Each structure stands twice: as structure tokens, then as C-alpha cells.
Amino acid sequence: MNNLFSAKKLLVVVASCMLSTGALWADVNPKPFVVPELKTWTGAEGQTALSGRIVLKNAKLKAVAEALANDYKTMFGKELTIVSGTAKGGDIVLSLKKDKTLGDEGYSMNIGSAVELSAATEHGLFWATRTLLQVSEQHKDGQLPKGKTVDVPEYKLRGFMIDCGRKYIPMSYLRHLTKIMSYYKMNTLQVHLNDNGFRQYFGNDWLKTQAAFRLECDTYPGLTAKDGSYTKAEFIDLQRLAEQNGVEIIPEIDAPAHSLAFTQYKNELGSKEYGMDHLDLFNPETYKFMDGLWKEYIGGKNPVFRGPRVHIGTDEYSNAKMDVVEKFREYTDHYIKLVESYGKQAVLWGALTHAKGTTPVKNKNVIMDIWYNGYADPVEMKKQGYKLISIPDGLTYIVPAAGYYYDYLNCQYLYEHYTPAVIGNKTFEENDPDIL
């Protein structure tokens, strides 16, 4: 009887504990909705009201603080004052800390009595402010949910390409796009600066087929498109704006295919055998022309292309004969080394399975866009030493009204099934270090 009473008493105590614990956990703040999703979240109870101050622990962080203050005012109409010194309740505190686990882009955010943002780099700290803005957007009263996150990206390169060659995209749109990308911690925008239409839609006449090179050019006056282009000053300013927002612009000059803009300008550069959208790789003038074009944009102390990487194209050249395959490989190797001689890292479209040959093509420290496995088998390219960007055309391309690609992305399918480790019909380990 006493044992039964004791058991009942114990059951009541346990039940009471469970109820009180459940109530306790019910008050813990859930993970905030942030894109990309936060890697970790430890919720706490209650909210923190922002004081309206940003406290700097390092003078180097002034630019990050100013960006946060400007964006906060734009979004919410409220001023944030930037100060240094001792933090008070509700302050946003920015600091740097040595933490190898955070890498270049990771950060921590601790919303307690104050909002503490810290990272190993200014870049990482800037991303922390983007998370703070996203959380604030859901709590416009300034009452932020208490809790802590340590957030580190899974992939180094997060972004996309925009085709400004086939269709002119106004500079105002590109500038706005970098801000949108930054808000979601996307860090790379490849700008495709030249391309052309399909001849069959222009009376099968190469000279009438739409083609454009969108950038101001002094080396070859008249090359720049008449239906929309960017001055060099505008393009430099775009890159500066992107840099301020944590985004790298990778400019692309696509050749030796997709090159009708160049051959319309100088007809003798076009291939009579493979079409005028192909540069003639057996003509020495082709190399002189392209060398001069690249020099204009990556040469000198203050080059037009400011970033560490440039894209040299190499997309979809004919492989009809082995002699042209070897010439294509020679061309590819030449322009990898040319841009490297100016201090740039080369990015290129994967084509070396399609153009399989014996002519060596540099692979060390070279990045390859893998868009279609028939052009470049990702397993083989990884073995050869290339760093890969996963951009499978069947899943990630948008070409409105073309019929052979999507008008819109299948967002639900991508969310449920796609990661960068899936490249066409090949699947790699998640976070493979060779997939950027």
C-alpha cells in the first residue's frame, strides 16, 4: 500500500515536472525564417527591443555598420546611430573574433540583452547584418526573438549567371540585382557580355543575325552594341557596388563560339567551315584580336574587370574534326594562361569531354562551369583537377519561350531534390571540396 502510494506520488511529481518543462519549452523562440536557412539555432525566452544604436568594437567595421544603418532606414524608416564604447541593452554590437570554424563567410548572432554580431572577417560580419535585417523584417516593432545562431555556408560560391549578350539588361536592373542577391547571401554574379541569336530566325543570314557585345570598347571602335551597352565607368561602378554588398561580379567574354559580334565587326575572323558564330582558330588574327580585347579590360593598374576572376567562355565550339578539336584545346589553354598573366583566375564553360584530345589544357587553379555532362563529364573533370561549378542546364536554366528550357524554375522540385552535388546524372558527396 505504501509502495503504491509512493508510486502515485512519484507519478504526480513527474507529471508536474513534465507539464512545467513543456510550458518552459513552449516559450522558447523557434528558429527564425531566414534564407538561406540558419545552420543552427538555440532558442531562448523573450524578446529584445533594439535601442537604435550600433556599437563598434573595431574601427575597421565602420563600412559594415553604415551599410546596416542605411538598409535599416530604407526598410523600416528608422535611424540607427553608430557609436563606439560600452554596449547597453538593446544595442547592436559588431565585432571581429579569431575563429577558424567560421571561415571567411561564417558568423555568429546572439540576441540577448544586446544583439551581438561577430565574425572572423568583415565579409562574414556583413552576412550577419543580412540575417539581422531578415529577422527584423518579421518583427517590425523592433522586438527581436532571443536566441543564438552560428551560421556557416555549405558552399563557397552561391549565385547565378545573367545573359546580357542576347538581351540588353539595363544597368539599373543589374545594380538592384546585386542588392537583392546580397540580402540572401548570394555572393557571385556572372555577367555574360556577348552572344548572338540563331541564324535560322534571321533568314539564315549571319550578317543579319542579332549579335551584341555590351561593353564600351576603345581598342575596336564600333564593336560595342548599338541597342544597349555599358560604359566602362558604369561597369566599374557596378562592381564596386557589388563588392560593398559582398557580391563578386565575374565578367564573361564568350569565345571562340558564340562570337558573332566579333566576326560581324571583322568578317575575316569568322570560320567559313563551322559558321560565322565561330572564330577561325586557324587564323593568327583571331588571337591578336582576342588578346587585344582582353588587354583592354584586365590590363593596367586599374583594370575595368576589378575582381579576382574572369570568365573566358569556351562554350559549344564544333568538334567535327580532330584538327579543330586540338585547336580549340590550344585556344582554351592560351586564354587560361593569358588571363592568369594579368593576375586573374580563369573560369570557363565545361567543354573538354566534347573536345577530347591530346593538346594539354591547364587545370590547376581553374574553375569550370559544368552545364551539360555531354560537354564536360564532371567525374572526369574532377579527376583532371578542375574546380567545378554545378549548373546543370535541365534544372537551373531559364530561357523564356525557347521551348527547350524552362520559362520558370521548378522551385519546389529544386528545393526537395537538388543540391550542387547533383550535376546532371552524376551525384557527388555533399560538400565535396572540388564543387564550389
Task: Kindly label every feature range from the protein language model.
Residues 1-7:
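N-terminal secretory signal peptides that target proteins for export/translocation
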Residues 158-162, 189-191, 249-253, 308-312, ...:
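Hydrophobic faces of well-ordered beta-strands that scaffold small-molecule active sites
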Residues 165, 194-198, 254-258, 315-317, ...:
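Active-site beta-loop-alpha junctions enriched in small/polar residues
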Residues 262, 267-366, 371-379, 383:
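Active-site neighborhood of glycoside hydrolase catalytic domains
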Residues 6, 12, 23-153, 346-355, ...:
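Acidic, contiguous N-terminal accessory segments
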Residues 101-280, 284-287, 291-309, 338:
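Feature activates predominantly on carbohydrate-active enzymes
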Residues 360-366, 373-436:
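Flexible, acidic glycine-rich loops studded with aromatic residues
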